[in-house]
Amino acid sequence: MTLTNYVQEVSLADFGKPFHHKAYWNKRLKTTGGRFFPKDGHLDFNPRMLEEHGELIFRKIVRHELCHYHLYFEGRGYHHKDRDFKDLLAQVNGLRYVPTSSKSKTNHHYSCQTCGQVYQRKRRINLAKYVCGNCHGKLMEKNQS
């Protein structure tokens, strides 16, 4: 079954309305489960949400995007802030927020040589340029494990 067929099935089963456009996987999505494009009506979905959280959570993400889709084409409020959107999302039991990833987001660990303050960062920092925020001591990179 293709992604578009799956979205069509969810739309008919949960909303009672057809889905007339295309649905695509988008590997570039990092922090969101999916996106709706009002200009041409297609939906993008993050494949990692299905891999990491399973079909039950992914179906709720599809419901969320279909709420945007159906409300837009009905001419009603389709933004997150709109009451129509919140009501329809609650009615179909969709997710309001995407679950956080189970993977650790901190890759680099630093500690102050003077006071021992520990810092965790996603990106590397220039140890010659930055110092401890507490005591202005020198930072050193800890071994990653």
UniProtKB/Swiss-Prot annotation:
Residues 4-140 form the SprT-like domain. The keyword Transmembrane helix does not apply. The active site is at residue 65. Its cofactor is Zn(2+). It comes from the Bacteria. GO terms for biological process: response to stress. Keywords: Cytoplasm, Metal-binding, Zinc. GO terms for cellular component: cytoplasm. InterPro entries: SprT-like_domain (IPR006640), Uncharacterised_SprT-like (IPR023524). Binds 1 zinc ion. One of its GO terms (molecular function) is zinc ion binding. It is found in: Cytoplasm. Zn(2+) binds at residues 64, 68. Belongs to the SprT family. This is Protein SprT-like. It comes from Streptococcus pyogenes serotype M3 (strain ATCC BAA-595 / MGAS315).
